[in-house]
Amino acid sequence: MSDLISYDDVIDAAYDIFLEMAPDNLEPADVILFTAQFEDRGAAELVETGEDWVEHVGFEVDKEVYAEVRIGLVNEENDVLDDVFARMLISRDPEHKFCHMLWKRD
């Protein structure tokens, strides 16, 4: 296996993919909200890889090779990312690019 992509680079890649795909996958009101409030409250953060990914991608997820990034808005009162617009599973292996996103649904 090749060297894995750093977690910082995973977060950057996830955010770039999110920005590209958000207009086609989120409600227009959510896109406007995220865009308007990202400067003050926006976040893309690495979290513990969820156990439910196997149900979404159809294979066992190696938590060393794959990372989960959540993208959304942070609650200013408790500094918690509680308005999640997307969850992304992304491969850290540069030889096997892969990502799968779960989008916020109202």
Curated annotation (Swiss-Prot):
Functional description taken from the UniProt entry: May act as a double-stranded DNA (dsDNA) mimic. Probably regulates the activity of a dsDNA-binding protein.
Gene3D superfamilies registered for this protein in UniProt: dsDNA mimic, putative
Native source species: Vibrio parahaemolyticus serotype O3:K6 (strain RIMD 2210633)
Pfam family, one: DUF440
Family membership: Belongs to the putative dsDNA mimic protein family.
UniProt protein name: Putative double-stranded DNA mimic protein VP1949
InterPro entries noted in UniProt: dsDNA_mimic_put, Put_dsDNA_mimic_sf
Family matches, as NCBIfam families: PRK05094.1
